[in-house]
């Protein structure tokens, strides 16, 4: 049986003391002492009845008579009375006894200078209020009234620290206070009937007093609508550079910007050209760039390069073509050509390695550089034409035979090409023009060609470094050193053994394979087009991509471009360097196709007044980034499911929205 023991001072009463008090009447199962009462569990009902009869009114402490009775469930409804202005000297027991004279008191809690008394019956509560309100207790006049939070319902709720069914005061319905601190402060609303746990209402949402100045973060729609696009569209921006811009931008240089690139010489293109070709090209080309003599010659002959090209200076430009704006950019333009060039080292590098390293001419070629002017010769390793008159003549001879090699349309150009070079090649135009005709016979004379390269050139090569010192006086050098020997050689050998262009790609010359190959195959595609007369250039561009040297190095897209397309590409402004912030651009012909997507990504319908608190946006890392805050990642906003975006989804949204911005607001695009 459960026995209720009231009027117990929990501060100085222990469970053991109560258990000893009830032990003579039966077996005590447990004893629990609360603040002002206790519960004793006894095994036998008879013992419990005897204990109640014997101990009710017993004074455990002087002046404190115990209230011993059978424990009953708490009434379902209790009436909560608020007692204010309670003296600090008044204890809860004294207050309880005061109210018990008017009816049964279920609970009495004193909190600082006020208290809550729960009475079982409504009539008792009203009688107590009427009799005790304004009564002086311990020197203070108490204020007794029915708690505005209403009555407690149910035993389960009575144990809790606060009432969840209390009615708010009439003055607090508009803006319910936090925990009872309302317009007119009410102790009853602020604190419930708990034993020390202050019973306040659950915190209401703060009213929007200053709605205008609040952060856009808190004014926004529910964030669930922003999280969905984050996961549903993960590839909208991040996958774009590789998907939509991959073909449009990376493949551009060779296809659509081939000629457009040519108009803007950039160091980056030179570097990219240096990095792209094979090993055989890398060092000679860099050396050619480093050669001041070839550079100066190249710079001086840039003008003639595009027009009728004097052979001496033109060949030096051919060697110094890295510095030339037109040919250098054509290098950069042939992105795919250079890519294929990178694939060619298997063949070209093999040619160069086998012939250049093995043949006698290779040794003479190296010794020649070491003999007299190793620095200038090393610099001219790739600028074979700029290297000397001898090599330039050989270069010219190769150029003509090389031009003879691709097709009939190019062999048709060999005539103007030979005429172009008439300044220093005057002794060989006949051989040059006749040379393409014997293209088929070239394959039959690899030995002759190799021998020619080794034996006649060896002597001239030995003499050549002496003339190399006069590299700038290229015309004089051509006539001084090698006009005789080399002219005789090309007249004799070029017609017979030189004239077959088909074998030139298969059977590289011992001396000229590496230098000429490294330079010619990728660069001829653009540089020859720049060198030729207009009609020759037109026919040259019209040739199939594999016509140059049988390996299809020049980009098919670049060569098959019509003249109109070439002109358009030439007129295209240089493409700016793309960044993460660049608007997506899938093609050149329809720049507004993705305007809606751009508006969803970049369009911001935030006014400047709403951006005053934009630093708070860092609280939400991913789902809601609308106004620019700190880092560039903030601009990678995904399309948001926002209702207002439908109004701004026009084609020119990205441009018109900026006009509505405040002038001091930087888009930082």
From Swiss-Prot:
Which Gene Ontology BP annotations are present?
activation of innate immune response; apoptotic process; centriole assembly; gastrulation; innate immune response; mRNA splicing, via spliceosome; negative regulation of centriole replication; positive regulation of transcription by RNA polymerase II
- Give all residue intervals belonging to the RRM domain: 1-73, 79-149
Q: Which GO terms describe its cellular component?
A: cytoplasm; nuclear speck; nucleolus; transcription regulator complex
Q: What is its main location?
A: nucleus
Q: Which stretches does the entry tag as region TRBP-interacting domain? A: 307-354
**InterPro entries to which the protein is assigned, alphabetical:** Nucleotide-bd_a/b_plait_sf, RBD_domain_sf, RBM14_RRM1, RBM14_RRM2, RRM_dom, SRSF
N6-acetyllysine-modified residues are 164
- Phosphoserine (modified residue): where? 161, 220, 242, 244, 256, 272, 280, 520, 523, 527, 562, 582, 618, 620, 623, 627, 643, 649
Q: Which PROSITE patterns match?
A: RRM (PS50102)
GO MF annotations, alphabetized: mRNA binding; splicing factor binding; transcription coactivator activity
Crosslinked positions for Glycyl lysine isopeptide (Lys-Gly) (interchain with G-Cter in SUMO2)? 126, 135, 138, 149, 153, 164, 600
Tree of life domain:
Eukaryota
Report the locations given in the UniProt record: Nucleus; Nucleus, Nucleolus; Cytoplasm
- Function as written in the Swiss-Prot or TrEMBL entry: May function as a nuclear receptor coactivator, enhancing transcription through other coactivators such as NCOA6 and CITED1. Regulates centriole biogenesis by suppressing the formation of aberrant centriolar protein complexes in the cytoplasm and thus preserving mitotic spindle integrity. Prevents the formation of the STIL-CPAP complex (which can induce the formation of aberrant centriolar protein complexes) by interfering with the interaction of STIL with CPAP.
Subunit composition and interactions: Interacts with NCOA6, CITED1 and XRCC5/KU86. Interacts with SS18. Interacts with STIL and interferes with its interaction with CPAP. Interacts with gamma-tubulin. Part of the HDP-RNP complex composed of at least HEXIM1, PRKDC, XRCC5, XRCC6, paraspeckle proteins (SFPQ, NONO, PSPC1, RBM14, and MATR3) and NEAT1 RNA.
The protein in question is named RNA-binding protein 14
Quick one: which gene encodes this? Rbm14
